[in-house]
Amino acid sequence: MKTKLVRYPEDLAQHIESQDIARALHTLFLETLMDAERRVYAEENHDLSNGYRPRRVRYEGHILQLRTVRTRNKGFYPKLLHILRGGGGTVPKLEAVCYLPASEIGGIQRYVSMVYKELYSRKQIARLSATLQNLMEHWRGRSLSPHYERVILETLSLPLPHRAASAGWKLVAVLGQDVWSYGELLGVYGVREGVEGDALGFVENLRARGVRAVGAVASDGQRAMEEAVLRHFPRTI
């Protein structure tokens, strides 16, 4: 059977908002960035992790509860938290570039440097950038479940670099739900209006990571991605 397209007329935006896709994604990214900081710190100080402490921050219109790494000697404190308390600076743009094709941004080190400025040395910025990129690539490439009852697509409002924005790129977060309505962030994909290859690349990525069937798909207007799911995934395995 083919995947069915689920339409949510008036309540589509509310339905997607209720999944807290953006909130979950922002939390994941900020915790990953702090983890990258902690790894660079550990390389220099050999101070191992010792659990987490909760921290509440405001970011992109959300109040997020973050897990902040503690270290045994209590010498580590993520500089990201200072930046967020000061308004966040260019952190949202760094988050955006982590999901765009490298050809559109020229690598993430420039944006890591824009975020941390003089808080880290050039050498530390280089290590932090490489660590963050490796962590994000691991997350983007992890294996997925073979079947999702529903896939939900939501356009993100993160600020894009001028070059990417001028080229028409937008970022779409993808949530997969199982039969118990448990949600899992599958990834974030850069797509352009009218470029069929971007939507096809999204589907090929899901297939390469193990997805074999999707029961239903809904979005806030991402027709090309919806149609790609309809064409390439059966409803059941």
Predicted segment positions?
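A detector of single, family-specific signature residues
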Residues: 2, 109-114, 193, 207
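Electropositive nucleic-acid engagement tracts
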Residues: 8-9, 29, 45, 50-53, ...
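Hydrophobic (often cysteine-bearing) scaffold residues that line and stabilize catalytic clefts
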Residues: 22, 26, 30, 91, ...
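Residue-level signature of catalytic and energy-coupling elements of molecular machines
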Residues: 34, 73, 95, 108, ...
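RNase H-like nuclease fold core
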Residues: 65-72, 79-85, 90, 118-119, ...
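Short, amphipathic alpha-helical "recognition" segments used to contact nucleic acids or chromatin
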Residues: 90-102
